[in-house]
Amino acid sequence: MFKQYSLFDISCEQASVSNFIKTVLEEGADLAVSVSGGKDSDAMLRFLSTQHRENDWQGDLLALFCDLGRIEWLGVSDHLCRLCTELDVPLSKLYPTRSMIEEWQRRHETLLAKQQDKPFWSSASARYCTKHEKVQPSDKFLRQYDFVVCAIGLRAEESSARAKKPRYQVRNDIASVWYKTPVTCKSAEEKEVWAEQAYQQWLDSGRKGRFALTWHPIHHWSLKDVWQENGTSCGDVARRVRLYQAGDIERAIADFPCHWAYVSGNTRLSCSLCVLGSGHDILNGALHNPWTWAELALMEITSGWSFQQGHWLADLSVGVLEVSLAQQRTLKEVLQSLQLLESPAPVFVLALLLICPVEQLLFWTLESVQAIASLIQEMQPSPT
């Protein structure tokens, strides 16, 4: 007979750390916190670092960041390094086999070789970007632990699909076969109950094999809760956005506890151009990451498949053409002056000059991106 924890205890429903998870962590489970540089994972890491210290949990606490390459927002890695240093939490950076853009390119080439006329971009129904670029590298890393909890910053408020997620469940891809959640467990409640039973089974076996959980500690948090844990508020973020839009970039960004992309107007921070992003965030991402926009828009033009169904990045070419070179340079100078972005080391620049052809280096200037934007505009098919 498996021991049952207080799954339906009302006080437990309101707590970020349920009685079951508390028990697991008190028994020495290592805690790996998945971070992206976004506000939710920032808040989760801040909260859990405090909980880990105050509860004297004996397992290791660490942060995991899966770097997706040049599609990341400028300064994400710098931000996470500062945050983890501030919280005294070790940060492990993981890298997928291919960066996100390289994965799209490979899939496009594979479909061409097979003469299959299919979209190659990831989408809501084909989220291989999450599976291949984040989950698989994380699982590979986590297999070094025999008893581990991986915390992920999903919130129910974000979507109906996320609202249906369990607070915790067995991490099937790395847990030993005896503890994997059966396919018959469909609901969040069933998956949570199974996790509790599987944990007791693991204890009864003398801790045989690997026991691993996925946990959503801020599942019930509101946006207000997230900003508050990060040391700011919805009102302060709105004030900073107004300053940024008025051109007062330094005052807008200075002392902001999260990544500057929120101050620039983004509502979420994922990839700088995300297939699941809103129209607003796509436009803002393109304006602030014109190099990435140019590369992806050219992939659209040459492949014939739009980045999002019915929405082309190439259609934003007029907006990207209007990007002010002065504003882009000012932004980078501000980020560097506030120590939010490291300047490339001179030795790195010299090495780049030695190994890269001049024509490749020229691509990464803002002037060349504007020229490419003009070309993309000309290549767009005329509306019928």
Can you name each region flagged by the protein language model?
Residues M1-S34, K39-T384:
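Nucleotide-activated chemistry modules centered on ATP-dependent adenylation/adenylyltransferase
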